[in-house]
Amino acid sequence: MKFTIPANAPAKPFHKHWQFCVGSGHAAMAMRTDYCEQLKQIHDELGIERVRFHGIFSDDMHTYDTMSTVMPMPGSEQVPFYENSFRLPGLVYDNVLKAGMKPFVELSFMPSPMAKRPTRGTFYWKPCIAPPKDEAQWQAYIQKFVRFLLNRYGKEEVETWFFEVWNEPDLKTPFFDGTQEDYFRLYEITAKAVKAVDNKLKVGGPATSNSKWVAAFVDYCKAHDAPVDFITTHQYAGDPISEVCDQKDADHMKDTAEIQAEYKVDFTQLFAGLKPEDGLLPMFRRTMPDNTETDDLNRDLLRDAAEQVQKQADGLPVYYTEWNGCATFGARGNDTRKVAAYDVRAALSAEDFIEGSSIWCFSDIFEELHPFPEEFHGGYGLVTQHGIAKPLFHALRLLGQAGDKRLELPGALDGEVSVAAFRDAADTQLTVLATKQNLHHFAGQSTPATPVEIEVELDAKPQSVQLCRIDEEHGNPLKCWQAMGEPEDMTPAQVQQVIDESAVDYAPAPYEYADGKLTVKTELVTNDLAFIRIVK
């Protein structure tokens, strides 16, 4: 397969929207030293500017405590005394700022004493996901929180932050015990409370899964004079909980409760052959299969959804505050180059429709379901619990370094094998990315290599040509870990060994130059990535 990069290819600014933000485990995680070290690594090496997490108001942050939450003895719920403090959120945001980043503030979830119902989400840390029982009390709480931030960090700093109301309110069981109307009302009173303290603060939503509710949300805000500065939503290629939105009308989706009601499983059959001592991960993987491996999903889903959402947003900037190749926690592909190939291609294809985005998430220091002990357990992170960089980390680092201009190559991203090209501002260096992307990664491991020929029109022979690959042998920490026997409790020496053995960098590459054309040849198997750097 041959691709040509013409000398006169027009260039446009390369919009690295994934550097806007990154997702994270819940707020309390940001008080861990290892979390903070990895967050700084993500900022310093990938250039990511913000971090977003759930649960800044959850009970483990102790922002609103009563006698019944502190000392739940019989009759304590009748005692009227309470304590409202944002000391722990302050420690969390202090750590974010020390890492060189800014918080993308997700206003979630509900302090349980303030909730209309005691509904808990399905997470390991059990957040309260009900709406407030007293709207005036909630608004006063939000206003006090905003004043706390302004006092602690200053008006000039906080006005650069973003405030997003809740997370995925369309998913009733894990995130919001209410209707669409309930969420819209919650958004309205919350946004108005924020603006009442400082009208320059940026507030937005609806923070839905699968690009849903945007048109209805915009209409509601207009009808109720609810302030909204930006639109947020989420999109995964495969999602086992809420169904994949692979349609132009992003509003008409099944309710999560309907999907779960249809989900029937015979656990006796499901767990046949497993032994209790095998641990939780094999059981979990059978319970939540990775549908990116079994279903024929749209490789252009993020682009198609973002294009539609941009139209529905009615001129407001669109931020995808969660996205990735797979929403299945524990999926084997999350530790492999499969997600790297998908995310890089998706980021490039959706570039024109997204103001900023946030890959979910930066680290396997993460406790939504359970803190799995295996170093490679299919977590969402760019790095493992011990900070070992996964293939997606390497891919984003290389893509971020590719240049500030992107060459316009119509149709070059359309096929399974695709290319993109970038140059620096001075036009002294050109980087070409070639990849063979397919979500059926494990089924496609044995596919034959595809020969790829890159032809670049150049006025003169280049000073150097270098190649950096992410494939089965390069940038594959999972393979290194497996080769050492899959140690569960890794020593510092073992961690460093995997880091060293899976590091990737550019090396001289063979090429031909004749008649004003540079030719580089390589081969790609499923989900390989090849970065070619040409110094003119």
Residue ranges, per PLM feature:
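Mature N-terminal, pre-catalytic/accessory segment of carbohydrate-active enzymes
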Residues: M1-E49, T526, K536
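Conserved, mostly hydrophobic/aromatic
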Residues: C21, V96, F145, F163, ...
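Short, acidic/polar
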Residues: M29-H43, W213-C221, A340-A347
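Substrate-binding cleft and catalytic face of glycoside hydrolase catalytic domains
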Residues: L46-D295, T328
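Active-site clefts of carbohydrate-active enzymes
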Residues: F267-E293, A306-A340, I365, L369-G379
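Aromatic/acidic polysaccharide-binding cleft in carbohydrate-active enzymes
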Residues: Y320-H441, Q445
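Carbohydrate-binding surface patches
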Residues: D414-K461, Q466-E486, E523-F531
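C-terminal beta-strand-rich structural cap/linker in extracellular carbohydrate-active enzymes
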Residues: E488-K536
